[in-house]
A protein has these predicted regions:
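Short loop->beta transition adjacent to catalytic acidic/histidine clusters or analogous donor-positioning motifs
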Residues: 1-2, 23-33, 50
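A conserved hydrophobic helix/loop-capping motif in glycosyltransferases and polysaccharide synthases
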Residues: 2-11
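Short, well-formed alpha-helical segments that are part of the catalytic scaffolds
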Residues: 11-25
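Active-site-proximal specificity loops/subdomain of glycosyltransferases
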Residues: 35-86
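Short, high-confidence coil segments that cap the C-terminus of an alpha-helix
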Residues: 83-85, 113-116, 200
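Short beta-strand-to-loop acidic/aromatic patch adjacent to the donor-nucleotide binding site
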Residues: 85-96
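Conserved catalytic core of nucleotide-sugar-dependent glycosyltransferases
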Residues: 96-192
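C-terminal catalytic/acceptor-binding lobe
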Residues: 176-256
Length: 256
């Protein structure tokens, strides 16, 4: 079973439309919602499998945004529900699956990899000129956190991956759930590095599948561009920021 956890701050009607779309496209998948918007908007969301994320670490400067509370709350949610997934997938609200077999391809890819964690651009960033690594390579709090838990020969090794689209085996999620991850550290560095030092194996989606070829930082995808792309059967796209066009996009995907 795959649990797919979505992070959103959008208005309630937008969130409910997205969760209905996902449930229709992937009926064999179990969905939940981590909501980081206003509490009063959270209360308006009709989708029942939701949890509120009030942690300030979700907000603030991009290089210090920490989504650990979302990952940990997802683990707490499925345990409360008595659900035992073997895989957990984490996407932001601007990540749009485009095919009904998207989740099957997620499973096929991680099984082909043999890894515990897959992410976009997932790699060892140590001694590279990658921006997030340069920002954190001498960060005493991060390095102390990693050294305290590391089973690796080099506790200063730093891994990174795009926060959107992370796919983990349940054992990896469980290893993060009851751990103090409250550092002011970017998710894209903190989560992969923590899992690496705990002894888990990490890999890059693109090494085993084309499922994330439609995932990028920028520019955002536009509806007209997706009209041309969808006949070529891409698996997903990120980022799609045009909230007003989401209903039309959902219709386009579901009728193909």
């Amino acid at each position: 079973m795959i649990v797919h956890s979505v992070l959103s701050h959008h208005p309630a009607h937008v969130v409910d439309a997205m969760m209905r779309f996902l449930g229709t496209l992937g009926p064999q998948t179990v969905f939940c919602l981590g909501y980081g918007g206003p509490r009063e908007e959270f209360d308006r969301i009709a989708f029942p499998e939701k949890f509120f994320l009030g942690d300030p670490s979700l907000r603030g400067r991009i290089e210090e945004q920490n989504f650990s509370c979302w990952i940990q709350a997802t683990g707490a949610w499925y345990r409360r529900r008595g659900i035992e997934p073997d895989l957990v997938h984490f996407t932001e609200n601007d990540h749009i699956p485009l095919r009904a077999d998207y989740w099957e391809e997620l499973r096929r890819t991680i099984e082909a990899s043999g890894r515990d964690f897959l992410g976009k651009w997932c790699m060892d960033r140590t001694n590279t000129n990658e921006q997030s690594y340069l920002h954190y390579r001498d960060d005493a709090r991060l390095l102390g956190h990693l050294a305290a838990l590391s089973v690796r020969s080099d506790p200063r090794t730093i891994w990174g991956a795009l926060a959107d689209g992370m796919l983990m085996r349940r054992t990896a999620v469980e290893a993060l759930t009851n751990r103090d991850l409250s550092l002011p550290c970017f998710t894209e560095i903190l989560i992969p590095s923590t899992l690496h030092h705990l002894g888990f194996t990490l890999g890059d989606f693109d090494a085993w599948s084309g499922i994330f070829r439609g995932v990028r930082h920028r520019p955002a995808f536009a509806l007209d561009g997706l009209r041309e792309m969808i006949p070529t059967k891409p698996w997903c796209c990120h980022p799609f920021k045009d909230v007003g066009s989401l209903p039309e996009l959902y219709e386009l995907i579901l009728r193909k």
